[in-house]
A protein has these predicted regions:
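Active-site beta-loop-alpha junctions enriched in small/polar residues
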Residues: 53, 94-95, 121-125, 145-147, ...
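Alpha-helical packing segments of well-folded alpha/beta enzyme cores
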Residues: 76-80, 100, 160, 179, ...
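A short acidic, helix-capping loop that chelates divalent metal ions and anchors anionic groups
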Residues: 58-63, 203-205, 235-238, 271-272
């Protein structure tokens, strides 16, 4: 077994080679984001963005990858933080890289490991030793990106959820609406903490009357499920700038369980190939969905700090 110090040294060397020191210079424009204005809503101290990715062509995509974005670096992401006011974050392994989590782990080191966590992708038969190593490297969950071809399947949830619960990690789930309907009983039976990406992709039209929404509401009532108020554009039919149909779903989630909502920018918005959204507007929409300062702070600070193991104060 490789000593822990050696593993850390390897990660540190990889990070130093890939990314120069992150600049603190003010930026007006953000790569992979429309607009230049700051949001009207003011982020509370210690605000956490629970969903963003980095991409780098020096890391080969997995065979069959369907999303192949241009490079999006930690430096680029810092510009987004300066624009919207967040200071902490959770880096999500994209489907592009399969189970090769090196880039997201190195990005965490470049951004500052005390203020960032990682959600990884692993094989269904991942050894316990690898999970422990990933835990040391800041990983706090596994993503089941089931709407895209990948190493994990719906059946993998049943296999891995108990193991992740032992680590106090999250099962981060990205499912199509029909998958949620078809697997409602399985989802209800899973142990541990479930986090649904992108408003759980509640379909439009239909929204609050749809079966997937009602299933997610049932999971919220169970008490071990969180919803990520991210990617309104994934399911919206009404579209920008307000994504009113998806926004109605988001506001209903907040009203039902404000203590189990988190937010993510989804930068660099890999699914939006023609026109990138305005991240400042998306942040202002979150404030509208929250309906008040107390819920806004819960969503951005209190809830994600508890879920991913950050300091609750942001200090």
């Amino acid at each position: 077994m490789v000593p822990t110090l050696t593993r850390r040294a390897v990660v540190g060397a990889l990070t130093a080679a890939l990314f120069p020191p992150v600049s603190r210079v003010q930026a007006q424009e953000v790569k992979w984001s429309s607009g230049t204005a700051k949001p009207r809503a003011i982020a509370p101290p210690g605000a956490i963005d629970c969903h963003f990715h980095t991409y780098d062509k020096r890391f080969p995509p997995v065979a069959g990858a369907t999303l192949l974005p241009e490079d999006a670096s930690p430096e680029d992401y810092r510009a987004l933080q300066r624009r919207i006011g967040t200071s902490r974050g959770v880096i999500i392994q994209p489907s592009t890289y399969g189970t090769d989590n090196r880039l997201q782990i190195a990005s965490r080191q470049a951004l500052g490991p005390e203020n960032f966590r990682v959600v990884a992708v692993v094989a269904e038969d991942v050894p316990d030793a690898e999970l422990r190593q990933l835990n040391e490297q800041g990983v706090r969950g596994v993503r089941f990106n089931l709407g895209f071809p990948g190493v994990l399947t719906v059946a993998s949830l049943k296999v891995l959820a108990p193991r992740l619960a032992e680590l106090d990690w999250t099962c981060q789930i990205n499912m199509r609406p029909k998958q949620i309907e078809d697997n409602a009983d399985l989802l209800m039976s899973l142990p541990g903490k479930l986090v649904f990406d992108h408003l759980a992709q509640v379909p439009q039209p239909g929204g609050l009357e749809s079966a997937p929404y009602k299933i997610i509401r049932g999971l919220l009532d169970r008490g071990k499920t969180w919803v990520k108020l991210s990617g309104a554009y994934v399911s919206s039919k009404s579209g920008p700038p307000d994504y009113a149909d998806a926004g109605a779903v988001a506001a209903a989630y907040v009203k039902a369980a404000p203590e189990r909502m988190v937010w993510g920018s989804d930068w660099p918005h890999p699914s939006e190939r023609e026109q990138k959204p305005d991240d400042a507007r998306l942040f202002d929409l979150l404030a509208e969905w929250a309906g008040g300062e107390a819920a806004f702070k819960k969503i951005l600070v209190t809830n994600p700090a508890d879920l991913y193991g950050f300091s609750p104060s942001g200090q």
